């Protein structure tokens, strides 16, 4: 039977209801005894520290070569799975989903992330090579499949040499030095991308989809090479492109009484002044000076504040309805620190000064000198757009540079995304591509392709372009012999030879996926000294790939080479694997 307790003490001690029945004589004896005086009758219980349970580990030593073979088996399983997507005739991979319909993808890094192998040692091998794909995706946004295939090549060729007794330390040093030298050679082969070539770069990355390539090229031409292009899931089966001009954010007018166009239910002002307040406006009297200036000047005014209380808002609405003022108000975008940053961005775009008490500015003493100016302002129920007049271009560029420095220091992807958003808003234009499809499964697959194409185009703008189709990597192999001469010893030169042989793997796999012999294709490509000559897997022809639009961004090829070499170095230096012993599942 459960006992009940009643709290009686002001400090929260609890006494049982029948405690008063305790024999008082007994208690007096205890309290007067030497035992009771010297020792606590009710000693505190010591809390026992929780036991630390460590899972047992299983050690796999590479004495007979079985551990490395298992690791390599994991690498091969992942690379073979991802490899089927490589090239214009690569296939799709169907991924099971716990919830909802299966996903059909053609994106290497998405496939790699889903792979978990049953054997723990093989799984570690797969995870190692997955790092090459993930890192390439983070830096270049494309080329993930090539990274995995190239890493597989480095590892396969390296394992053969190490198994024959070569020193893995010197071998990996040779791989590292050769890869570094080849990056320098790659930059010499690169050329700046022309506007007419942007569509080709995007199309190749999207699986030779000319429509996607043209749309991305058009988006970049409309917002500029350094403009911001974003993706959205469309509602129809067709792709669509539109450009949002000016600074747009998800905040609408605070009252529908401010509407100037009753059909569109929007507020539209030309040559508008802006008052920015980084606090809540509680008293309409604080606005008298600014509003009187607006009446005398005959200009429309937009107030952006943290919030506007009912009394102050009513005063603004009444003056607007009477026709005394052309006015509108909205709440500042964002929250907390981000809200203040947005207000500062708007101030720089419009030439305004933000009213802040911390810097000694008060609303009641504000005059025309703190107001900003916008060429156009459009407010709807949910969004607001401010188009600058171009007079603050230098200040905007300085602000963009500051934000770019913050992006380099930012660690979280979410923070980087928000900072990029701010750059887009300040730059005065965002192109939005709406990806359309017939079904949700097709939409997800198509969106991944468009995302890859967009990232590849941005990478091409950054570092230029080279010949695509795996031919640039194959041509780099011919530069290895000259690099070997500068290496310190024979084993480092063996490492260089490993790189030389592995560089043909991507081209051979592209050819294999197109149904032809990779070795024959690579020999025929190398037989022609023209660096632009190569195999077009989409048409099955040998031709000038640059003229045919088969182009890769230099940044993507560089990242593939660097990250594949890094993963191979880690792999070949490994000699022992530690994994957790799986606990047996409880019998139901």
From Swiss-Prot:
The lineage of its organism: Eukaryota, Viridiplantae, Streptophyta, Embryophyta, Tracheophyta. It comes from Brassica napus (Rape). One of its GO terms (cellular component) is chloroplast. Coiled coil: none annotated. One of its GO terms (biological process) is protein refolding. NCBIfam families: GroEL (TIGR02348), PRK00013.1 (NF000592), PRK12849.1 (NF009487), PRK12850.1 (NF009488), PRK12851.1 (NF009489). Belongs to the chaperonin (HSP60) family. It is found in: Plastid, Chloroplast. Residues 1-55 form a transit peptide. One of its GO terms (molecular function) is ATP-dependent protein folding chaperone. This is RuBisCO large subunit-binding protein subunit beta, chloroplastic. This protein binds RuBisCO small and large subunits and is implicated in the assembly of the enzyme oligomer. This protein shows ATPase activity. Oligomer of probably six alpha and six beta subunits. It holds the Pfam family Cpn60_TCP1. Keywords: ATP-binding, Chaperone, Chloroplast, Nucleotide-binding, Phosphoprotein, Plastid, Transit peptide. The modification Phosphoserine is found at residues 101, 478.
């Amino acid at each position: 039977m459960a006992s009940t307790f009643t709290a009686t003490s002001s400090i929260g001690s609890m006494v049982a209801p029948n405690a008063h029945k305790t024999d008082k004589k007994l208690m007096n004896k205890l309290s007067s005894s030497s035992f009771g005086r010297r020792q606590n009758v009710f000693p505190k219980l010591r809390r026992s520290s929780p036991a630390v349970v460590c899972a047992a580990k299983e050690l796999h030593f590479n004495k007979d070569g079985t551990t490395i073979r298992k690791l390599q088996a994991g690498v091969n399983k992942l690379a073979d799975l991802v490899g089927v997507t490589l090239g214009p005739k690569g296939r799709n991979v169907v991924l099971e989903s716990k919830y909802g319909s299966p996903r059909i993808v053609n994106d290497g890094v998405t496939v790699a992330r889903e792979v978990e192998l049953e054997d723990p040692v093989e799984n570690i091998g797969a995870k190692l090579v997955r790092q090459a794909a993930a890192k390439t995706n983070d830096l270049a946004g494309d080329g993930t499949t090539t990274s995995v295939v190239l890493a597989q090549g480095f590892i396969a060729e390296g394992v053969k040499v190490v198994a024959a007794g070569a020193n893995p330390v010197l071998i990996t040093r040779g791989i590292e030095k050769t890869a570094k030298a080849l990056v320098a050679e790659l930059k010499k082969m690169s050329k700046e991308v022309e506007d007419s070539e942007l569509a080709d770069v995007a199309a190749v990355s999207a699986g030779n989809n000319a429509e996607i390539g043209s749309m991305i090229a058009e988006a970049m031409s409309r917002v500029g090479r350094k403009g911001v292009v974003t993706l959205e899931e469309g509602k129809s089966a067709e792709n669509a492109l539109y450009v949002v001009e000016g600074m747009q954010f998800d905040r609408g007018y605070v009252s529908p009484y401010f509407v100037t166009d009753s059909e569109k239910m929007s507020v539209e002002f030309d040559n508008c002044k802006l008052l920015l307040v980084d606090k809540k406006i509680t008293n309409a009297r604080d606005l008298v000076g600014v509003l009187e200036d607006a009446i005398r000047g005959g200009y429309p005014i937009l107030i952006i504040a943290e919030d506007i209380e009912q009394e102050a808002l009513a005063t603004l609405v009444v003056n607007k309805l009477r026709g005394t003022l052309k006015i509108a108000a909205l709440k500042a975008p964002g929250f907390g620190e981000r809200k203040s940053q947005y207000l500062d961005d708007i101030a720089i775009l419009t030439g305004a000064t933000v009213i802040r008490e911390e810097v000694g500015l008060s609303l009641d003493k504000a005059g025309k000198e703190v107001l900003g100016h916008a060429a156009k302002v459009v407010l709807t129920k949910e969004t607001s757009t401010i188009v600058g007049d171009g007079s603050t271009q230098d200040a905007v560029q300085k602000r963009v540079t500051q934000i770019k420095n913050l992006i380099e220091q930012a660690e979280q992807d979410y923070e980087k995304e928000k900072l990029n958003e701010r750059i887009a808003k300040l730059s005065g234009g965002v192109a939005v591509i709406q990806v359309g499809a017939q079904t949700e499964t097709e939409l997800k697959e198509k969106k991944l392709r468009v995302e890859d194409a967009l990232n590849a185009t941005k990478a091409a703008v950054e570092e230029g372009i080279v010949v695509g189709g795996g031919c640039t990597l194959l041509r780099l192999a011919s530069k290895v012999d000259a690099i070997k001469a500068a290496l310190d010893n024979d084993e480092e030169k063996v490492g260089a030879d490993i790189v030389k042989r592995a560089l043909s793997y991507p081209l051979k796999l592209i050819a294999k996926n197109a149904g032809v012999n990779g070795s024959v294709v690579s020999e025929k490509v190398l037989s022609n000294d023209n660096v632009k000559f190569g195999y077009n897997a989409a048409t099955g022809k040998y031709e000038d790939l640059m003229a045919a639009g088969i182009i890769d961004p230099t940044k993507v090829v560089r990242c593939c080479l660097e990250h594949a070499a890094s993963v191979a170095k880690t792999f070949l230096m490994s000699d022992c694997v530690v994994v957790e012993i799986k606990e047996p599942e409880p019998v139901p």
